[in-house]
A protein has these predicted regions:
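Membrane-interface helix termini and inter-helical loops of multi-pass transporters
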Residues: 25-33, 90-97, 143-157, 206-220
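Hydrophobic/small/kink-forming positions within alpha-helical transmembrane segments
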Residues: 21, 25, 75-80, 84, ...
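Juxtamembrane C-cap of transmembrane helices in multi-pass membrane transport proteins
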Residues: 22-33, 38, 84-96, 104, ...
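Specific alpha-helical transmembrane segments that line the substrate/conduction pathway
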Residues: 37-48, 87-121
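Juxtamembrane helix-loop boundary signature in multi-pass membrane transporters
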Residues: 1-14, 109-169
Length: 220
């Protein structure tokens, strides 16, 4: 049975967007857990789920040095740093609106296209540049009322905005590197390897931040 991915693709993106939206709501309920623990377990669970398909395609686990490099960048930025920054921004909802965090995070297509131009040699139109500028300006005014940064809460509002923007940068830039890795490999293999690498990296971050006690005891 032939699957027309051009027709199905947009619907899969819509489903993914819905899941990401739910992810943010569920993530807030895990406020008692360190962000590194959340990152570790979400990727460990994902790895366990995708493992059967990964082992089925184990013969295809041959990557060039550049592909391994791209996967490592994706794992570090998208898997670890992006999720850490996004979670940190959500924790600061006392200083910045929950919806603003999501809106800033949605700027990632701008970063995705920027890196696609640099690394994938894709071309963009002047119209795209115009709308990208409009999006950045809109994001600024959505974040800071009347265009003025309020320091009544110290610098926490600015920090929260920067964390959300950092997540957009991490996830957006990783999109281009993911695309590079997918040029010659199946999405199942690339996704499986990404989850594997991110799980290991997240565990390393857990020990770097001295939060290993929370691995088995969330209240630690």
């Amino acid at each position: 049975m032939h699957i027309n991915w051009k027709k199905i693709g947009p619907y899969l993106i819509i489903i993914a967007a819905v899941l990401w939206a739910l992810d943010g709501i569920l993530r807030r309920s895990l406020f008692s857990l360190p962000p590194t623990i959340i990152v570790f377990y979400e990727h460990l669970i994902g790895l366990i789920i995708i493992a059967p398909w990964l082992f089925k395609n184990i013969r295809n686990l041959k990557f060039t040095k550049r592909e391994w490099g791209a996967l490592l960048v994706v794992s570090i930025f998208s898997g670890v740093l992006g999720t850490l920054w996004f979670t940190t921004a959500l924790v600061k909802v006392n200083y910045i609106s929950f919806s603003v965090v999501f809106l800033l995070q949605k700027l990632q297509p701008i970063f995705a296209m920027t890196f696609a131009i640099i690394f994938l040699k894709e071309k963009i139109s002047k119209r795209y540049l115009l709308w990208a500028l409009v999006a950045m300006l809109a994001a600024y005014f959505v974040t800071f009322k009347n265009g003025l940064i309020s320091f009544n809460t110290g610098d926490e509002t600015l920090k929260a905005a920067l964390f959300a923007l950092g997540a957009a940068f991490a996830w957006g830039s990783s999109t281009a590197f993911s695309r590079f890795a997918l040029l010659r490999k199946s999405n199942t293999v690339v996704t499986g390897v990404r989850f594997f690498l991110t799980t290991i990296l997240a565990l390393i971050f857990v020990f770097i931040f001295g939060q290993q006690a929370a691995l088995m005891s969330p209240n630690s």
